[in-house]
């Protein structure tokens, strides 16, 4: 996990690779403008702070460490650090050749939701009904898998000990160029490009959190 100075991660695919599901224009704007802006602002914010400079990104935005700094700085770290962390996860979950969930994640989903279709409906319903900018997450904690939404660039790890398995960006910049105000269409399209099999590694990481 990155530490200061933070860098914009290179995508694992070309900007036009997800067309027609996501246009090249949207991908370029999303990655090179929005994501990069969060990285630049985060670097400027934590520059010169020895404590913050040593923290990996996921620890920087964690509940434990946010509680150790002043409220104004903590809010900015949630915004800029969360923006960097959230977008990094988002771009990593997309794939030109998505695969179905692996054995570990499949078992957890079946145990928690009954089957994948039930989980898919709950996730999409929560994402579609979320008001304003934010994110929809699949989170693993000691309580098992849960679907959560957060406002703005907040992440579940700002508030609890958990591991975000995947998250979908609900800000308009993620879909407005392609879908205008049709958020439901965007969620349906992006869902088809999620590489679920990769998340077994995150499930393994989460075992250290539970």
Enumerate the predicted regions with their spans.
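Feature for soluble, non-membrane regions of globular proteins
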Residues: 1-210
